[in-house]
Amino acid sequence: MTIRSFILTFAALSLMGSSSVHAEGRTVARLFWQGHQSAKLKWADLQKSKDGYALSENDISGFPELDTDDQTLVQMQADDGLLVVGVRDEANGDIGSGWVAIETGATQEAHGDHFHWRFPEPPSVHSKLIDSGQGNPAHLYRYGKSFVMANDQRNGFTVLNSKSVRDADSPAEAGRFYEGGGGHITLAVAEGKVAYSTWIDREGENAGRVDVVRLGENAEKGYHITCPTGVLHGATYCDDKVFFAPSDGVCWVHADLEVDDTADSVTVNHLEIGTDPEGNPLRTGAFTTIDHAVVFTSGKAEQSKLCFIDASCDTPDVQSLSMKLASDQSLKTPIIGKGSGGRPIALCFAESKEAPETDQLYVVDLDPDGNGDYSDAKAREPIAVGPSQIEGHFGHHDAVFLPRGRQIAVTNPGDASIWVISLTDQSVQAKFECEGTPTSLVSISD
């Protein structure tokens, strides 16, 4: 089925059914989204004219046919007009895992001290590496100009970038593998010089372990540090500090950019998030960053909270905003960006596996007074969105900020739709139906 447009004009606030009319207009953004059930990547140019928005769904030329029973797309990242998406299978990588690199067809046009994206070509697959030797990645990050892929079954990770992918004689030569981390790996990379790679172990000698790995020409595994609790899942770098997500709270260390410290000389700092009603320590599973802040969610239902850490502080602590959700709802990892005027905003989906028709989106103004302190963060009234379709780690909503931060685009997996929502008045400005179950979303735009 091709996408059908639901156009909301500026003169009307209600959505009046569907339309197959696609207004000719300027391209606001080029969108890429994953269809979870089909294991395909789709794309469309989001266009805007005086009549409203239009979107026409397309397949990507050369995208591999995956086994929908045993292979899935995982995280994806974009840089310099190149998009990389990870591939994972259900047999520890034996069926075929790895990555696919897509030329987005987008180019940067210089305008004095800034640039604009132009879209002269349709997207196409540049290269791919899917075989039994890629370690079954679950996580693919972007730090600076680097794509960093966790090779879980190989106890290591691969670093590549847009230039290395484009210049490589073969896909196997596009990246460099490093040993570090184990089981189900999460990663932080500091200034392109050092990686912190986690171990997932709950107990034993590798519980709480983080390998510190020098990157570049003189690469080597430097040493490892240990957090006080295990089940590490989550890591990030912000403002000269590296943060980790163990089973209890948050841990952080000063980034060792030269990898000249030793395990004994590194202080692993611990921050508490709080406890649940049974007295168990709260944790998180992933971080996002914006400017000097690390942002994450913790807790469930009425105990849900959006948390922030000011990484620029010498002695950072956890601040939080209570987000009292329904008993069957939980918060997805926040999506962070800049709204109108450059103010930081967090998009927080409250999702219910039992009743996805009740899913909501909270827009949180992180710094209403603009002083750089998030202690005055405030959530707006929730927006009713389409349903999720949660299956394990998949089937969640996603969102991207559109140019100038005045609108966002969101995916609704449960009813196969993509919406455009205003951040000014929180109205739904357009709805588009699409094939399959749209989940993860990436935007190429100004």
Regions found by a protein language model. Give the residues of each.
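Long, acidic/polar, low-complexity amphipathic helices and coiled-coil-like
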Residues: G112-A245
